[in-house]
Design a protein with these regions (language model features):
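N-terminal acidic leader/helix
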Residues: 1-32
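Short, charge-rich amphipathic interface segments used for partner binding and complex assembly
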Residues: 24-60
Length: 60
């Protein structure tokens, strides 16, 4: 399975369940004073997580 991230890069997903767990962890990381890069990272991991969920529902 593949998905395209916010930067337009193709990501190959070999283990969808593990990828969902990892992306879910990353999307919940927060810092007390987020920089512009941190805010982008929040959006990035939320986007990846949502795309992985879509892949999961398409599998069912």
């Amino acid at each position: 399975m593949k998905l395209i991230d916010l930067d337009g890069r193709v990501i190959e997903v070999e283990n969808l369940d593990l990828a969902l767990l990892q992306a879910d962890d990353y999307r919940h990381y927060r810092v007390t004073t987020p920089t512009e890069n941190d805010i982008y990272r929040y959006a990035y991991w939320e986007d990846v997580y949502q795309k992985l969920l879509k892949l999961k529902t398409e599998q069912l």
